[in-house]
């Protein structure tokens, strides 16, 4: 929601389609992180055709879908979140975005293995795939680039999760809390569950 607020300030109207949260939940979260959201239009629906009808009347400059697993196309087979539904809704979203020349953000769930849930085809249809990963011991979030058609894939973004939302970490050294036990002979090494970074 913070990203959508920043985009709305720069671009104009953005549409936030949420099948995950109700408008009341989104409003509460927005107020908690200090977002007025005057140019953010919220639609709590999973009906892909209804979403595009509203988009036609609003003419948003950006659309965020949260999440692809909650969308449903009545002309497609399968239950909401099924491979067919994810594939067909993904096609419709991408075709709509191309026809209107607007960027879209599609959030999705990951499997226990850490892969994008749904058909692998979805990853091939989009320009960029990002993973937001949590940390077990700190309130840090890492945004990793898994695919980037227009730039490098070796980039990460570091964020601190707080009551007021995500805050960018510009200097990791200053953000790591070692409980004040910095002394001679101590070494701080960045590792992820035993793997070398």
Where are the predicted features?
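Conserved inter-motif catalytic segment of the P-loop NTP-binding fold
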Residues: 2-92
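A generic structural signal for well-ordered alpha-helical segments
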Residues: 7, 55, 97, 122-123
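Short glycine-/polar-rich loops that comprise or flank the Walker A/P-loop
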Residues: 11-12, 38, 101-102, 124-128, ...
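Short regulatory helix/loop adjacent to the ATP-binding pocket of P-loop NTPases
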Residues: 30, 115-125
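Conserved P-loop NTPase
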Residues: 36, 56-62, 69-71, 134-197
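Short loop/edge segments at beta-strand edges and connector loops
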Residues: 44-46, 108, 170
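Substrate-engagement module of ASCE P-loop NTPases
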Residues: 84-109, 125-136
């Amino acid at each position: 929601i913070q990203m959508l607020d920043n985009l709305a300030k720069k671009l104009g109207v953005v549409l936030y389609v949420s099948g995950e949260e109700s408008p009341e939940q989104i409003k509460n979260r927005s107020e908690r992180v200090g977002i007025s959201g005057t140019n953010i239009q919220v639609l709590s629906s999973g009906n892909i055709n209804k979403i595009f009808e509203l988009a036609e009347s609003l003419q948003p400059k950006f659309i965020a879908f949260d999440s692809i697993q909650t969308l449903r196309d009545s002309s497609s087979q399968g239950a909401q979140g099924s491979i067919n539904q994810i594939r067909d809704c993904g096609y419709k979203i991408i075709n709509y975005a191309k026809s209107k020349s607007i960027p879209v953000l599609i959030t999705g769930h990951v499997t226990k293995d850490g892969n994008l849930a749904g058909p692998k085809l979805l990853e091939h249809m989009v320009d960029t795939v990002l993973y937001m990963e949590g940390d077990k011991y700190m309130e840090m979030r890492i945004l990793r680039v898994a695919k980037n058609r227009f730039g490098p894939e070796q980039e990460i973004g570091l964020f601190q999760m707080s009551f007021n939302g995500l805050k960018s970490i510009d200097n990791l050294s200053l953000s790591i809390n070692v409980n004040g036990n910095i002394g001679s002979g101590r070494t701080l090494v960045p590792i992820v569950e035993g793997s070398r970074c």
